[in-house]
Structure formats: structure tokens, C-alpha cells
Regions:
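Residue-level recognition of beta-strand termini and adjacent short loop/turns
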Residues: 9-11, 24
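Short, compositionally biased
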Residues: 102-115
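Extreme N-terminal starter segment of soluble prokaryotic enzymes
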Residues: 1-3
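A structural motif shared across PLP-dependent enzymes of the aminotransferase-like
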Residues: 39, 94-105
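Cytochrome P450 core scaffold surrounding the K-helix E-X-X-R motif
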Residues: 39-46
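Short glycine/threonine/proline-enriched tight-turn/helix- or strand-capping micro-motif at secondary-structure
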Residues: 11-19
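Glycine-rich beta-strand-centered segment in the early N-terminal region that forms part
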Residues: 21-37, 49-95, 114
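Mid-domain Rossmann-like dinucleotide-binding core that forms the NAD(H)/NADP(H) cofactor-binding site
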Residues: 116-169
Length: 169
């Protein structure tokens, strides 16, 4: 039986069995190999450490059934209209901590076979940092201040370097 991590109440984490939804024509069923925990975001949600007027309060209520934001796995089954993925392919997905997922093919990214799945799992946080670098126009500035030394902050430093920023504080 598939399992997932949920936060039933503030400060509580459990592993529960759940039933997968039926596979639709453009869906893929994925067996998760690794999921990455964003310690800042997930701890904030778990401990309800946010103000009532924030996006966290609007988006996350208890029981919180969708913990986690990124995972990698392999395709176990495909719907009849799936075009670009096949059984056995390794994929990245922005999904919750769970042993299995059923999602649209369009919500998966194929991982090349020579990429280690543990490393590929970082793709989501790298994308978050990239979006910040893009929005901050790192390609046209010489100096940037990055506040935060978590995974996203560290990846923002790497993006700043890749964009050629000379002074990274």
C-alpha cells in the first residue's frame, strides 16, 4: 500500500497509508526514490510559525496532506495518451513526500540516465534560487547581497557566480 508523510496537527508528523487516484489518460504513476525536505519551509508549516495574514496561513492548514515539494522517482505505469515518458524513466516532480504519485505527464521532468537521483532531487531548490537570480537581474549587476545560508541561499550564491557577479556578500 502506498504511504505518505502528513502533518495531522501542529507539531505532529505521521506516516499513513493512502489510496492512489486512478490513472487518467495523460497521467503517469511514479514510484518515489527520494524526496527532498526543505527544512525552513516544512518546519515553518509543521510548527505553524507564521502570521495569519501570510501566504502560509492561506495555503497550509491542518491536516496538511501535502508535505514536501520535490521528489524523484521512476515511472511504473503510463496512461494511453502519455507521449514523452515510458515505464522505467527517471523523473523529477514537484510533489509531496510519498512512496507513489499519480500526476500528469506535463508535471514531470525527465532525468537523464547519467544523473544521480540523489543529486537530481535538488533541482527544485536550484530552480527557486534561479528564479530569484533572474528576478534580481543578476546578469547585469556587479554586487549582490544574499541573506540566508540554507539550501536556497547557497544555490543563489552559485547562480550569482554563474551569472558573473563579481562581489557576492
Amino acid at each position: 500500500m502506498p504511504q505518505r508523510i502528513i502533518f495531522p496537527r501542529k507539531g505532529e508528523v505521521i506516516l499513513e497509508d493512502f489510496k492512489l487516484p486512478s490513472l487518467q489518460t495523460q497521467d503517469v504513476q511514479i514510484r518515489t526514490r527520494y524526496s527532498l525536505m526543505s527544512i525552513g519551509t516544512e518546519t515553518t508549516i509543521l510548527n505553524q510559525e507564521y502570521d495569519a495574514d501570510t501566504h502560509f496561513a492561506q495555503r497550509f492548514t491542518f491536516p496538511q496532506l501535502k508535505t514536501g515539494v520535490q521528489a524523484v522517482g521512476y515511472v511504473e505505469e503510463i496512461g494511453p495518451d502519455v507521449k514523452d515518458l515510458k515505464v522505467g524513466d527517471h523523473v523529477f516532480m514537484r510533489m509531496a513526500h510519498g512512496s507513489h504519485q499519480v500526476i500528469a505527464e506535463s508535471e514531470c521532468s525527465l532525468i537523464p540516465s547519467d544523473i544521480d537521483l540523489k543529486e537530481a532531487c535538488w533541482c527544485g531548490l536550484a530552480k527557486t534560487a534561479f528564479r530569484a537570480a533572474w528576478a534580481g537581474n543578476f546578469s547585469s549587476i556587479n554586487q549582490v547581497l544574499i541573506i540566508g545560508a540554507g539550501a536556497v541561499g547557497q544555490m543563489a550564491v552559485r547562480w550569482a557566480s554563474a551569472f558573473g557577479v563579481e562581489s557576492i556578500l
